[in-house]
Every structure is written in structure tokens, then in C-alpha cells.
Amino acid sequence: MKVIYSAVAVSAIVLSSAASAQDTRRADLLRQRAEIDAQLAALDEAPASAPAKPVEGSPGDVIVTGRALSLTTQVSGQTVTTIGDDAFRNTPATTIADIVRLSPGVTVIQGNGPRDVGVSIRGSNARNGFGARNIQVFEDDFPVTQPDGLARFDLTDPHAYGAVDVVRGPSSARYGNYALGGAVNFRTRRGRDIDGIELGVDGGSYGYVNLFGTIGHAGPRYEYAAFGSFVRGDGATGHTGYQTGTINAYGTYALGDHDRVAVKVIYNEGEFRLAVRSSYNQYLANPYQQGCAVAATAAAGCGTISVFVNGTNGTRIAQTADEGDLARNDRRTIVGTRYEHDFGSDTTWRTQATFDSRVVNQPTSATPFKGTLDSYNITSDVTNHGRIAGMDATSFVGLFYNYLDNQSFSFNKTPAGRNGFGALTQTVFGDIRNLGVRAREELQITPKLQLIAGIGAEYSQIKMRQTAYTYPVGANPVLALVPANRDFWNVAPETAVFWQTTEAVRLHARIGTGYGIPQNGQLFVTSAGVAGNNSDLNAQTNVGVDVGAEIAIGDTLKAEVTGYYEWYRNELVSQSAGVNLLAYTSNVPRSIHRGVEVGLAWRPLPGTKLEASYSYNDHYYTDFSERLTAGATSAVFSRDGNAIPGVIPTFVNARAVYDQPSGPLRGLGGFVEVTYRDRYFIDNGNLLAMPAYTLTNLNLHYDPPGRRFSLYASVQNLFDVTYVGSASVIANSLDPATGLQNPASVLSNVTGSIYAGQPRTVYAGVKAKF
């Protein structure tokens, strides 16, 4: 009985203390609300031109904020969409495709490996089968696109991110080289939001497991967050198992009232087994490459490569991906630091330096590739917040320099599996340098009208040398040297107007320009798909016009619509010459990219939300003739008016969400998501098209207030649709007997193009916070 009485007494004390704590907390909240209301009233009474009062705080406040003009967040003068982590927090988020496809104007395809993703903004990367080209990619405003123009997403785990910013349209005035399509910035979660330790595990079909954790905290002068994960899976397609580990950390520290530093670290290492890209007919016969262990007894539709028996020349034999053990083993290390200093309350100087090392070992085909690509990126700029002619103005000027040291090797493959490297076929040594200046002015003409103008100028230098080796049977090896010493000068202006017509409607119009020099790998592959001289490629450029509107009615309705029209010159188009050959690149003199982008977020009832993004892309050649050759027969074909291959004309993503807003089941919810992709061509002649498809995803989750514990279950591709997940652009060919192009029935046998998309997959995950 004594124990019972003691328990009752303790319970009474706890309950009374809890009640007292609640009363105290309520009083504090009411006091804070009164202070906020008073400050808002003071702002309403102040003149529109009054400068903003500097942020002040008590010793417990966290005020480690940058004052320089951000490259990618809260962007003015661009067409931009931000995706918060509430859209993907309770989903599998196995790749960044699960995030960026929620933005209008963005399409995604599977890349070279289970974690690799090809990302296109307005079709920017549609002719490339992996990674991202023709856009700039950042993490926390640190560059992760190397100076050769390539960004890859194997190193990213979406669980690390709190938001993603997608900037659409030509943007070289702001981002420099390769920003023809725009930019993407991944923002890691902040220490103040984590405030402790979070641990989680996801599991799913085909052996998928993701173990991840985050630690974060913030204090009066510092803030940090560190994320780590280990992911593995067997893959639905044969020979696509993988395992990869990621570390991603970001921290800031205020040295004083006027000085701040930030540090960024990313490390990723992964081992990814790869299937052979199929022809369309192979895909139809065996989409997931099952029964393909041995070429001699392989099932119908199995893809193979052809390797020299001796690794040098002579007789070749066929090998499946299993026999050749095709794979990628890549390591990426990025370390960056940023320093900001305030010259008074209006002017900030910022300097940033980033080291980026990419070490690759890629026996992915009959010509394995190894290389080390180390790069350095330095920027320094000044931002001033002041007034010009009585108008609020933000002025920006900056310098930038980046450098890539390329050391790469290609080999013939032998039959000896993953480490079967035979005779050397080429080496590429050299460097790429980019040096430039950019300036920007943002003027608040009236409280509702803003004018933005910017310009960037850049000098780029490519100094590379290829040494190519061939091994004729019964003769001495032949060595050929191909130098590529190229200089490029590019200037990119832009201007934009934003007009807040009413409290709910904002209109914008923008003219932007972009440019991108050839990548070093494109300079050394001929149209025959072999190593050789292709160093006369030109830089591609574009000029684009955006016109659009944004509607925001409280938290109930947010919508955006943008129409764009872009003129391209010397567009770089890559094509596959076959599974045993290298992809080659050519310039297209003139082409047009135009389309419409729509985004919607509507909350018709408490707890309900309808999200949708729609992209329409009409991209076509206006001046392009292509020569095809077969033996002694050669013919030229006009591609004028043809759709640019690889570009998906219509892409729709819609999600209907319900989350219980109150009561004991608050945080319980789910959504149904539908994705539609239109039919698209994969050749310049527009003869072979990949079929359209629709996917349906189902999600249930429980994420209560406080987020101490959450869980989800998800079914991706609910109806188990078989679809083309990725299709590299293929080359057209000529019938020597007729002098005509070979039809779709022949192109359907061209290998080296297609990966099937993921079949029905079930996931579940749980997270806990301490």
C-alpha cells in the first residue's frame, strides 16, 4: 500500500507540475505573440523605403546567417521552384529523381547504374544517358559540377536534404559555363532543425536496405549537421546489385559580429554492377535481363559485349554482363570552405574555395575506363544592399576561377572479368580552365515592380592530348597523337522584370543566355565510335525568353505557369554507335526549344493537398543535315523540323495527399501519385520511338507532431508496368543497296541504348529522434 500511496503522490506532483508548465508555456507564447504583433504593426507604419533593421538576438539565439547574394536560394530574376522535405520526408527517396521530378520543367531517367540518375531541365540532358550536363549543380551553394561540365548523383542520398531549389532557363550570367538549362541546389538539413540525433532504416524489394543517421545542433555562434548512410541492393535487373556509403556535412561558425565561415564535406564511394544496355528488341524480349549468366546458354534478349580473347586484337568472344562482371567503382571527395566579412551593415565580401576529386574505375563495356579528375573552384564577390536614385538596390560583382586536371586511360577488355584490363587503347592528359567575372543589379523600381539585370564574361581553355593505340594483327602497334588546344570566349547577359500586380498574383518576364564548351571526352571520339580526332567541336549557346505568372492565395492555393522559347546554336548532340563502341558528339547549327511549365499546390480541405507538375517540351531542329555512310555509299539527310531525340514531350506528375490534421491520429496520412511520360524518339531521323507509360505509386505514413518517431510504407509502380527507364540516343544508319535510311525495324536491333525501369517495388522505413 505504501508503494501505491507513493506512486499516487508522485503522480499528483507530476500532474500539477505539468499543469503549471503548460500555464507558464502558454503565458510565454502569448507574450511572444504580443511582441510579434507589435513589431508587425511598427513595420506597417514605417515608410516603404525604410531600410530593414539589423537582426538582433539574445545570447541563446542562433544568428549565423550569410548576407551575400545567394547563388541558388531566394533567387530573384529567375524562374525557380523550391521543393521542401515535406514532399519526400516520408517516402523511400532512393535517388534524387524522387525529389526533382516534383518540379515543373524537370524530367529524370535512369543513368548508368542503380543510383545514377540523368536529370534534365527543359531537355538539357536528354541526349546524355547519365548524370547531368548543361546545368550547374550545387550543394549548400558549393559547386558539385566539375569544370568539364559533368555532375553525377551517385554521391547523393536524398535523406540528407531539407530542400531543393530548381532554377530553370539559360543562366550563364549567374552560373557561368554549362548553365544552358539552369541550375539545381541541394540544401542539407540544418542543425537547428535536427537538434539531436536521428537514426533510420529503409528496406524494400530486391534486397534494398538503407541505414542512415544524422546529427545536428546549433548554438549562439555555430551550427552544424552531419549525415551518413550505407545503402545496398540487389537490383531488379540482372547484374545491377550495388553498395555505397555517403558522408555529407555542413557547418557554419560566426567568428564575430562581422565574420562568418562555412565548411562543406561530401564523401562517397560506391560499387555498382552494371547490366548491358539493350536494343529495343532485346528489351521487349527480356526487359530485366534474366537468365543471362553465361553467353553460351543465355536466354533470348540477353545483352552481350564483344571482347578480344587476348585483350589486344584478333578473335573476339561474346560475354554477358555477369561474365564480364561489368561495374563501376567510383570515389568522390568534395571539401569546401566559405568566408564572409561585412564592411558595415550594407556590404559583404565573400570568398569560397572548393576541392573536388573524382576517382573512377569503370569496366562498364568492352573498353574499360580509369581516371583521376581533380578540380579546384575559387570565387570571390562583393554584395551591397543600398539605394540607387532613391530605389532599393542589391549590387553584386564577383570573380571566379576553376581548374580540372584530367588523367584518364582506356583499355581493351579481356575475358578475365572485372579486372580483365587488356591493351591500352587511349590516354587523355591535360586540363580545363575557366576564368571570368559576373555582375548583377537588382532594383526595386516601386514596391511592386522589380528590375534585374546581370552579365557574365568567361574565358575557357582546353589543353588536352589524346594518345590513341591500335594493334593491327601481325603488325606493329600504331600510335596516334591528337592534341586539343582550344580557347573560348563567352559573354552572357540577362534581364528580368517582376511585377506584383496584386497581393495574390505576380507576373514575370525574362531574357537569359547560356553557353557550354565541349566536354573533353567529346573531343576524342569520332563518328565511327572509336578514339580519334573530334576536336573541332564548337561551344553551344542559347538565348531564352520566359513569360509567366505565380498565384498565391494564403496557404490554400499556390500555382505557377511559365512559357519559354529558346534559340540554340551549335547544340551538342551525342549518339550511341553501338554497345562495343563509344558515344560520339556533333554540333547542330540551329534548333528551337519551347514549351510550357505548370505547377500546382492546392489545399481544398483541412489535411488534404493536391500537388501537380506539368511540362510540355517542343524541341526540334531548324538547321541540321546529317551525313550517313555505309561502305562506298553516302547520303545527306535533312533533319529540319525533326524532334530532338531523347526529349520527352509531355511529363506529368500528380499527387493527392491526406494527412490527419488533429486528434489522436494526427500525423497519419498517405498519398496516391501518378506519373505520365509521353512517347519520344531516340534517333535524329525520328524513326524509332519509345512508348508512353503511366506509373502509380501508393504511400502510407505516420509522422506525428514532434517527429520523435515516424514510419512509412510505400508501393512504387503499383500496377507493375514494364517501361523504358532510360534510352540513349542511337545513330541512324544507311542501307547501301538503296541509299535510304534503315527503318525502325533495323534500328530496333541497335544495342547500347535501353535500360528497363523499376518493376513493382515495396518499401518500408522507420526513423527515430533522440
Per-region residue spans from a language model:
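Extracytoplasmic beta-strand/coil segments of soluble accessory domains associated
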Residues: 65, 72, 97-142
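N-terminal periplasmic accessory domains that precede
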Residues: 96-99, 118-122, 135-139, 152-154, ...
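Short acidic/polar hinge/loop motifs at secondary-structure boundaries
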Residues: 142-168, 291
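Transmembrane beta-barrel wall of Gram-negative outer-membrane proteins
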Residues: 196, 203-232, 237-279, 285, ...
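Face-selective signature of the C-terminal outer-membrane beta-barrel domain
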Residues: 260-266, 326-472, 482, 498-500, ...
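Membrane-embedded beta-barrel scaffold of Gram-negative outer-membrane proteins
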Residues: 348-354, 360, 500, 506-512, ...
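Gram-negative outer-membrane beta-barrel transporters
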Residues: 459-460, 564-568, 586-683, 767-769
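C-terminal beta-signal and adjacent terminal beta-strands/loops
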Residues: 513, 675-681, 702-770
